């Protein structure tokens, strides 16, 4: 299936270069409807989901200035035995994009790896602790700081969520001089190919700067407004931007209490032959001049990008052409000169009072350990597709 898609994309590119016109619309509809019917409606594996996803593009409405507005895009979901399935060749269905969406949601497996690493003076990356978890692609999302909220369509951005992140990454702590690294790998069901679709990292110093700023600001506000009666669990959600701004990952960050037992110093950690001390030295590109003190594999910029439309309805989505602009551009440095640009999302719940947490925070040492729990990774559909079909970068953390 993937080979057929690659061949068709190459054929369209060659034809466009020769004629300058590209393929006729009817030719494209015939091919992509055939692909959809053959690989998703007919070839159904026993363990495969019985859902079908369609990308519908509704006619654009005329704007107030008389110009035609942008077409609205919706994702429709049906069971395979539904009598309401759109007819093959329906002109309002984007069949090419529907094939891509079903491919990413149903034909691929995904493994995310979160690791605590350090960088040597020679530029090598040493992995001290890592945890891999299977995740699933979804065209919808829900807030990770509250349970039971209704999911919302996020397409064309695909989410890979870890709902039980506190359990999965329970012993993932980061300290001074370390960094948290994230890698998401896609592979087909037969394991004939695999490719990295997301890589990113954040240094402890940058993570702690954001965390301390948010907790102290929230504590000061609560001290004035609640007289210390407001209960607060000091967990903050920080976003990690991918390379070249491609998608982002979210980390749930909280302080390790002094009574907790550090995962470091165990028998496994002290063994030089342990996988915990795996050394990674392979990097595809040299560090850029701006980041000559860190491998270019990592993209530590954390300034958050903000969705363009916060009030979109559940079934509405941004068009795939907008996926690169789904968030506003941000600076490409990793030093967090302006922490206030990051949106603060605090997890409210039971625990010690906010004021007490803030006072304790000010009394603790500067380099306290932090829990760093990966909550999700999100990427635009077309960027995932490009990495799968064209790039196929080899994993580093999973190697």
Swiss-Prot record:
Residue numbers spanned by region Disordered: 254-335
Biased composition (Basic and acidic residues): 310-329
Regions of compositional bias (Polar residues) in chain numbering: 255-264
Protein name stated in the entry: Uncharacterized protein KIAA0930 homolog
Taxonomic path: Eukaryota, Metazoa, Chordata, Craniata, Vertebrata
């Amino acid at each position: 299936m993937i080979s057929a898609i690659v061949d068709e994309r190459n054929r369209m590119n060659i034809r466009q270069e020769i004629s300058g016109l590209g393929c006729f619309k009817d030719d494209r509809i015939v091919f992509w409807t055939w692909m959809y019917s053959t690989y998703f409606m007919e070839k159904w594996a026993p363990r495969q989901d019985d859902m079908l996803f369609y990308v519908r593009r509704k006619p654009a409405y005329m704007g107030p200035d008389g110009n035609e507005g942008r077409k609205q895009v919706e994702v429709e979901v049906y069971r395979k035995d539904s009598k309401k399935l759109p007819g093959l060749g329906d002109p309002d269905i984007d069949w090419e994009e529907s094939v891509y969406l079903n491919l990413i949601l149903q034909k691929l497996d995904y493994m995310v790896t979160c690791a605590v690493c350090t960088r040597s003076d020679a530029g090598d990356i040493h992995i001290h602790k890592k945890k891999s978890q299977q995740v699933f692609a979804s065209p919808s999302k829900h807030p990770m700081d509250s349970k039971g909220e209704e999911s919302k369509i996020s397409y064309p951005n695909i989410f890979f969520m870890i709902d039980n992140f506190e359990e999965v990454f329970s012993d993932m702590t980061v300290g001074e001089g370390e960094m948290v690294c994230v890698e998401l790998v896609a592979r087909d069901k037969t394991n004939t190919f695999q490719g990295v679709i997301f890589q990113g990292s954040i240094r402890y110093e940058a993570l702690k700067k954001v965390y301390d700023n948010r907790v102290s600001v929230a504590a000061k506000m609560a001290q004035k407004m609640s007289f210390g009666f407001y209960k607060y669990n000091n967990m903050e959600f920080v976003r990690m931007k991918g390379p070249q701004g491609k998608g982002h990952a979210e980390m749930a960050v909280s302080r390790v209490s002094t009574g907790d037992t550090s995962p470091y110093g165990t028998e496994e950690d002290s063994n030089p032959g342990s996988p915990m001390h795996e050394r990674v030295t392979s990097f595809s590109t040299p560090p850029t001049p701006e980041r000559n003190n860190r491998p270019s594999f990592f993209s530590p910029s954390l300034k958050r990008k903000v969705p363009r439309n916060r009030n979109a309805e559940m079934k509405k989505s941004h068009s795939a052409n907008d996926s690169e602009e789904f968030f506003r551009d941000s600076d490409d440095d990793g030093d967090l000169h302006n922490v206030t640009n990051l949106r603060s999302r605090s997890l409210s719940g039971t625990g010690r009072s906010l004021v007490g947490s803030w006072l304790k925070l000010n009394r603790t040492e500067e380099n306290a350990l932090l829990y760093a729990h990966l909550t999700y990774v999100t990427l635009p559909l077309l960027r995932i597709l490009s990495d799968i079909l064209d790039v196929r970068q080899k994993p580093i953390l999973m190697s």
